[in-house]
C-alpha cells in the first residue's frame, strides 16, 4: 500500500512542522514501513539553527526536512537518513581538508551566511565528505539488539537484486548539495526500490573536486521482508581527478 501527498508546486507555502506528514510518501511491505519526504531548500531560520548546532557552515543547498526511513512496524526499530545528522558527521577538524586554489576565498564567503557562529569559522572539511551511514532509532529494542539488526557479517545478496522483479515503490531524495564555489560538486542523496520480497536503499556521498579528487561513499541497506533481516553495508572509494574519465553523482544500483 502506497500513499502519496507531496508538496510539488514551486509557489506552495512551506509547511509548518506539524504538517510535515502531508509531504511524506509511505509504502508498507510486510512488517516494514518505508517513508520518504521531499521539501524545498531550508529557509534562513532553520539554517542558522543547524549551523549553531553542528558548528560549521552548511552547504548552499540543504534540504533539512527531507528524509528516508525504513521502520520495522512491530518493534518501532528505524534506520533513518536525514540532512542534519549527515552534516554533523562531517569532519570538524583540519585533518582531512582538501586544498584548491580558491579554498580560502570560498571559506571567507561562507563565514557571513549564518548568525549561529560568532567567531572565525573553525577548520572543517569544506567538501562535506560525510561518513554518515544512517541514524538508528531502536524503538522497543535495546541498543545492542538494534545495532545487530543493522550491522552483520552477511553480505547483500547481489544475485537476488539483479532479478527483474516488479518494482512496487521507488523514490530519490537529495539531502544536501554544494557546488564548492564552482570548484566541483558535493552531494548526498538517496535512492530506493522496493520489491515484493526485498528492498534496496542506496545513500551516496558523491564528491568531485575539479583537478583534485573524485570520492564516493555508499551506504546500502538491504531488507528481506520474509525473514525481517536488515543488512547495512558501507563502502568508500576515491581516486585522483585525472584518473577518472567520466563521473556522475547520480546514485545507481550497480555494485561495481
Q: Where do the language-model regions lie?
A:
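Hydrophobic alpha-helical membrane-spanning segments
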Residues: 6-22, 32, 76-80, 86, ...
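Short, isolated positions in well-ordered beta-strands
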Residues: 34, 39-41, 78-79, 214, ...
Amino acid at each position: 500500500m502506497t500513499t502519496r501527498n507531496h508538496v510539488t508546486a514551486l509557489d506552495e507555502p512551506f509547511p509548518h512542522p506539524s504538517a510535515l506528514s502531508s509531504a511524506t510518501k509511505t509504502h508498507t511491505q510486510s512488517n516494514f514501513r518505508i517513508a520518504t519526504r521531499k521539501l524545498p531548500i531550508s529557509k534562513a531560520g532553520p539554517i542558522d539553527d543547524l549551523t549553531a548546532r553542528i558548528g560549521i557552515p552548511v552547504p548552499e543547498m540543504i534540504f533539512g526536512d527531507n528524509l528516508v526511513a525504513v521502520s520495522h512496524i512491530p518493534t518501532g526499530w528505524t534506520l533513518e537518513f536525514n540532512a542534519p545528522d549527515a552534516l554533523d558527521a562531517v569532519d570538524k577538524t583540519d585533518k582531512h581538508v582538501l586544498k584548491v586554489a580558491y579554498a580560502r576565498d570560498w571559506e571567507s564567503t561562507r563565514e557571513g551566511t549564518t548568525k549561529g557562529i560568532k567567531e572565525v569559522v573553525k577548520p572543517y572539511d569544506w567538501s562535506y565528505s560525510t561518513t554518515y551511514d544512517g541514524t538508528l532509532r531502536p524503538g522497543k529494542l535495546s541498543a545492542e539488539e538494534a545495532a545487530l539488526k543493522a550491522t552483520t557479517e552477511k553480505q547483500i545478496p547481489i544475485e537476488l537484486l539483479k532479478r527483474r522483479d516488479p518494482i512496487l515503490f521507488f523514490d530519490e531524495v537529495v539531502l544536501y548539495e554544494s557546488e564548492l564555489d564552482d570548484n566541483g560538486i558535493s552531494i548526498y542523496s538517496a535512492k530506493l526500490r522496493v520489491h515484493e520480497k526485498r528492498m534496496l536503499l542506496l545513500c551516496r556521498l558523491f564528491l568531485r573536486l575539479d583537478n583534485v579528487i573524485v570520492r564516493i561513499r555508499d551506504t546500502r541497506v538491504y531488507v528481506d521482508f520474509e525473514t525481517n533481516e536488515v543488512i547495512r553495508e558501507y563502502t568508500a572509494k576515491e581516486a585522483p581527478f585525472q584518473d577518472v574519465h567520466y563521473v556522475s553523482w547520480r546514485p545507481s544500483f550497480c555494485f561495481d
